[in-house]
């Protein structure tokens, strides 16, 4: 048994002993009334609303954008298909466009690459964005902007400026970004 297995077994045993020491009413209440998915969803919605409201009240636009950009870079690291786009587009704008086309509408206009989530969408693709209210100049879109920036920078090996053209959360019919590659 390695240390990790030993620790897991010890914690399980300790928790089992603690459960025996809990009065009957408390133990049965804990096991028969776990929070349901709807309660957890409501909690997450409220928590995200509070977070974004506080960010709006306490932080300047630059700081908010930096925070959400960190989330966007994390999203890139967490999702293999995003890493695959960068890997398949490594070192070549044309290869990057081909890799992007598997999941997005993309086209080039001179030194600008357009990335669009179709002409019209019914809802935001980000699951986290669905759990807090839409606002004008919605900062959540900075997360997605940073994800695309990370894909471009990883593939091309240099800083790339990515801008939000429009987004569902900001009142547009779709999400549309431009990457300045020239």
Regions found by a protein language model. Give the residues of each.
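C-terminal segment of N-terminal export signals and the immediately downstream linker at the start
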Residues: 21-57
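A short, structural micro-pattern
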Residues: 107-109, 156, 171
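Short amphipathic alpha-helical segments
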Residues: 144-152
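N-terminal secretory signal peptides and thylakoid transit peptides that target proteins
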Residues: 1-14
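Hydrophobic h-region of N-terminal signal peptides that target proteins for export
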Residues: 16-20
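Amphipathic interaction/junction segments at domain boundaries or subunit interfaces
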Residues: 58-140, 146
């Amino acid at each position: 048994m390695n240390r990790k297995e030993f620790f897991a077994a010890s914690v399980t045993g300790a928790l089992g002993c603690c459960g025996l020491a809990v009065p009957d009413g408390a133990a049965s209440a804990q096991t028969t009334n776990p929070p349901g998915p709807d309660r957890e969803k409501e909690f997450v919605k409220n928590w995200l609303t509070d977070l974004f409201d506080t960010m709006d009240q306490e932080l300047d636009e630059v700081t908010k954008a930096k925070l959400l950009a960190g989330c966007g870079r994390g999203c890139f690291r967490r999702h293999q298909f995003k890493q695959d786009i960068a890997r398949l587009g490594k070192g070549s704008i044309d290869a990057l466009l081909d890799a992007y086309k598997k999941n997005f509408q993309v086209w080039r206009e001179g030194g600008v690459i357009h990335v669009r989530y179709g002409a019209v969408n019914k809802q935001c693709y980000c699951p986290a964005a669905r759990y807090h209210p839409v606002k004008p100049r919605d900062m959540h879109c900075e997360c997605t902007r940073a994800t695309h920036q990370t894909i471009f920078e990883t593939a091309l090996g240099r800083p790339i400026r990515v801008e939000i053209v429009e987004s569902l959360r900001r009142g547009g019919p779709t999400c549309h970004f431009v990457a300045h590659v020239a």
